[in-house]
Amino acid sequence: MTSEFFAAQLRSQISDHTTHPISYYKPEFYTPDDGGTAHLSVVAEDGSAVSATSTINLYFGSKVCSPVSGILFNNEWTTSALPAFTNEFGAPPSPANFIQPGKQPLLSMCPTIMVGQDGQVRMVVGAAGGTQITTDTALAIIYNLWFGYDVKRAVEEPRLHNKLLPNVTTVERNIDQAVTAALETRHHHTQIASTFIAVVQAIVRTAGGWAAASDSRKGGEPAGY
């Protein structure tokens, strides 16, 4: 995932003018949505930062608690695959995700700390929301650093998501119709999301200090001291 070759390969498949059928992207994995995830973004008064995402995967995880600590165990390996078995999400087995020694469960979590060339933290961000996490963390970063939106707008801006399987671009109901039209011009199949798309938490350095936003999609509010 972090190799320059892999990044270049993905970049070569992206076009500003059109999307493509699933087969064009040569998919090798499928990640089911999860439901037991939370994200926390923190900046201390000395400028040190923490971006932490925690998950038990599905609601109530493995549904098994430790008899000693009472901690609920996760069921993270359900995001992986077993040969000859289709998982509960209807996903066929993928060799890339077979359970093997030394491997980690497949995850979408991407807690992020953006640092400037001066070494100072510029943005702390992350999200909860299954396969939507990566997309919407990236969107919050793009909205703030590229488009210049303040952190509140970057977090609250209507979002979209496409996880390739199925090859449908889901958009939030209040997204600008011009965005949907532009997607369809590029041959995207769009549909309105039945609920919100992911939940983002972000902190951004400003000229006067720090600004924080907690996604109202799930009733969140930022806190400071």
From Swiss-Prot:
Gene Ontology BP terms: glutathione catabolic process; leukotriene D4 biosynthetic process
One of the record's GO cellular component terms: extracellular exosome
Pfam families: G_glu_transpept (PF01019)
Binding site for L-glutamate: 55, 76, 107-108, 129-130
Entry superkingdom: Eukaryota
PANTHER family per the UniProt record, alphabetical: GLUTATHIONE HYDROLASE LIGHT CHAIN 2-RELATED (PTHR45027:SF5), PUTATIVE GLUTATHIONE HYDROLASE LIGHT CHAIN (PTHR45027)
Family: Belongs to the gamma-glutamyltransferase family.
Task of the protein: Likely to be catalytically inactive.
Name of this protein: Glutathione hydrolase light chain 3
Origin species: Homo sapiens
Source organism phylogeny: Eukaryota, Metazoa, Chordata, Craniata, Vertebrata
Gene: GGTLC3
